[in-house]
Amino acid sequence: MDKEVTKIESDDTSSVEIKVLLFARARELTGVPDLTLKMPSGSTTQKCLDELVLKFPSLEEVRSCVVLALNEEYTTDSAIVQHRDELAIIPPISGG
């Protein structure tokens, strides 16, 4: 069974490609567990999140409260992404 990969591309000749993992409510809002995102070189994790919200406006619901992880380590929104990095979008998880 082939897995469909969602790609979001930005028009720029000098770019990096990263894998974005979506968890919990972010996954529900987008309908995808992961995707490939092409961004200009030097982009921050915040710029990546901005691009995701443009593609999936419903993510605005969780944008202000997500935690970002870059290559399995929590990070800030000013971290620079590199080619083949993995960016996780982790909304708060509630339950009982």
From Swiss-Prot:
NCBIfam families: moaD. Heterotetramer; composed of 2 small (MOCS2A) and 2 large (MOCS2B) subunits. One of its GO terms (molecular function) is molybdopterin synthase activity. It is found in: Cytoplasm. Acts as a sulfur carrier required for molybdopterin biosynthesis. Component of the molybdopterin synthase complex that catalyzes the conversion of precursor Z into molybdopterin by mediating the incorporation of 2 sulfur atoms into precursor Z to generate a dithiolene group. In the complex, serves as sulfur donor by being thiocarboxylated (-COSH) at its C-terminus by MOCS3. After interaction with MOCS2B, the sulfur is then transferred to precursor Z to form molybdopterin. The modification 1-thioglycine is found at G96. Belongs to the MoaD family. MOCS2A subfamily. It holds the Pfam family ThiS. This is Molybdopterin synthase sulfur carrier subunit.
